[in-house]
Amino acid sequence: MRPSRLLIRCVLSLAALATIASVAASQTPSPARLLVLLRNASALAIVDPASGHVLGRVPVGKDPHEVAVTPDGKMAFVASPSEGISVIDVPAMKELRRVDTGALSAPHDVLYAGGKVYFTAEGFKTIGRYDPAANKIEWMLGIGQDGTHMMVLAKDQQTMWVPNRGSNSISVIDGVAGGPPKFRTTAIPVPGKTPEGLDLSPDGRELWTATRGDGGVSIIDTTSRKVTQSFNLKLTDANRLKFTPDGKVLILDGGTGTLIVLDAASRKEIKRLKVAPGDTGDGGVFVMPDGSRAYLGLRDDHSVVVIDLKTLEIANRFAMGPNSGPGCINWAFLR
């Protein structure tokens, strides 16, 4: 065989192998998963974050509100106000068990930290902690405020911040990891109405909360435990607020289907991005830890919108199916 023909065959073979490898790589599923609560469908959707393809649905309690996940991505915990907390095996895509938090307790938010699952029980005006390894509720703590709803935990996992919608206050629980009787609670009144969405700044110095009842934002200094600033953004239904790693604040205004982007340092508005044609109902905002993207669950639009946080534009939209009602979103990286 002539050397030139041999060379051509080698080049063609290498090209074919490269094509096969490329196809194989494109067909290899990513270990990352989006966990999307489908409130209308009462299910947890497990989604390929690259394609938006729904890999499976796990039935959970009625009208699920929030979802937490373990660092290894293998277990998720879903709160249903009427049917307790579902414990989910993410790789197997099945519910392992359901935790009864008590009649009329109305669990709403869930947060995984230090091997435990913290949850709010809005009906009892309490927070609680569940040990998934022992499958038992370790304790419940009375907050003494109405509408105990969401929660956020400081990086040291010792201080928790909880908005109380009915009392127009934020509760601070110090020493929460130690359990009773080691912790203490303090209620901080906020000037706005119905605080709900909240988050801590990346440096932990400020807590921001969106006041859903009047379209504003209140900022608390985490050292002095005082409200330092409030301003009205004239929003119609600001129910979720999240920080990005670089210090932006994202607020989802479900009433107008708009994402508001603020610069936390200057307190200035950067952009208002239309993400749906109209009212999206209750929604969810999840920010990737690397700050590259944000995912918005738009309940009444039955979609998940992907935001490029560099360009602040819509990068993709994933349809979740008719009458699915996507809300809270979390991220599982299967290890």
Q: What are these regions, as identified by a protein language model?
A:
Residues M1-L12:
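Bacterial N-terminal signal peptides that target proteins for export
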